[in-house]
């Protein structure tokens, strides 16, 4: 494992700031687990009420190989914490990230546009022109078949802490219709639960944007590889790095061979 990632892992949850991060992650993961279970029950209930069957199943991975996957800062911090507790999932992500990053480099224009508009879309603040621009760039991104680096053999390696955007939608159509090239794709039926993300559990220090969304694999990797430096790049969180790196416990850890 790269030295910078190992170091960031060692100092992530020590000292006053680190303990605040860890408390947040533990509470957030626990809360999100309950919310996700409620989402799953709601989707199952709504499908049954419509006399439909949810056709999503482990091993498919079509959505994970097509769609842009966004997550909030809170979700990405929780994923990082979970990865630190699950060594094989962490190692696999680090092995696959470069391939994913190389693919999104070719999609930089549409990805940047999506990142700029995603928060407005999720919070229903986008204009009609912005909605059209968002959909156009999403179509461009989806046509590239960029597989999520957390997908392995059609299954999510971080399923327990997967983003809400992944948990909130299911297909009611035959699985083969999910393919972009399938002639019946436009006839697909989806079932979706809208989450009030504006009311999601806030980060333990509130960033200036209020709710920060990013391409999930990118922000997760940034936190793993850059640690507090990545968090300090977020408006409103600049002080975190200074507070953490001057903490006596962190300084003592840094002096260790």
Set out the residue ranges of the language-model regions.
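Short loop/turn segments that flank or connect secondary-structure elements
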Residues: 1-257
């Amino acid at each position: 494992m790269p030295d910078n990632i190992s170091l960031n892992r060692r100092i992530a949850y020590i000292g006053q700031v680190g303990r605040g991060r860890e408390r947040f992650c533990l509470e957030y993961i626990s809360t999100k687990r309950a919310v996700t279970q409620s989402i799953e029950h709601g989707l199952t209930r709504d499908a049954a009420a419509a006399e439909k069957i949810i056709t999503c199943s482990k091993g498919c991975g079509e959505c994970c190989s097509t769609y842009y996957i966004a997550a909030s800062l809170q979700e990405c911090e929780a994923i990082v914490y979970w990865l630190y507790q699950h060594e094989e999932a962490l190692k696999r992500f680090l092995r696959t990230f470069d391939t994913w990053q190389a693919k999104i480099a070719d999609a930089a224009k549409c990805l940047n546009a999506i990142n700029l508009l995603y928060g407005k879309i999720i919070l229903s603040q986008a204009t009609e022109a912005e909605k059209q621009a968002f959909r156009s760039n999403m179509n461009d991104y989806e046509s590239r078949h960029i597989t999520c680096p957390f997908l392995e053999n059609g299954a999510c390696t971080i399923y327990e802490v997967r983003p809400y955007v992944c948990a909130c939608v299911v297909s009611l159509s035959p699985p083969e219709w999910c393919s972009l090239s399938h002639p019946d794709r436009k006839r697909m039926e989806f079932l979706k639960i809208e989450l009030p993300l504006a009311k999601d559990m806030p980060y333990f220090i509130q960033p200036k944007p209020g709710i920060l969304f990013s391409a999930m694999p990118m922000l997760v990797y940034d936190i793993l590889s850059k640690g507090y430096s990545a968090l300090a790049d977020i408006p409103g969180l600049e002080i975190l790095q200074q507070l953490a790196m001057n903490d006596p416990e962190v300084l003592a850890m840094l002096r260790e061979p």
